[in-house]
């Protein structure tokens, strides 16, 4: 079954290479709160369809 989620993408590029983590949230407000709490690297939020 597929559902839509607000996904927080957190990207860090450093001397060790490239790292990306994705956290899926059911609400945009929660995704924005998580994105604001991340201090290192770049973040962006996107609405995506995920298999559950």
Please provide the spans of the model-predicted regions.
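Predominantly extracellular/luminal cell-surface or secreted proteins
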Residues: 11, 25, 48-50
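Short aromatic-glycine-(Arg/Gly/Cys) micro-motifs in beta-strand/loop hairpins
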Residues: 1-20, 43
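Short, mixed-charge low-complexity intrinsically disordered segments
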Residues: 19-20, 32, 37-52
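GIY-YIG-like beta-to-alpha core
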Residues: 24-30
């Amino acid at each position: 079954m597929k559902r839509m989620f607000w996904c927080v993408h957190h990207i860090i590029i450093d001397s060790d290479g490239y790292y990306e983590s994705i956290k899926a949230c059911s609400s945009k407000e929660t995704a924005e709160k998580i994105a604001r709490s991340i201090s290192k690297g770049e973040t962006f939020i996107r609405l995506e369809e995920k298999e559950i």
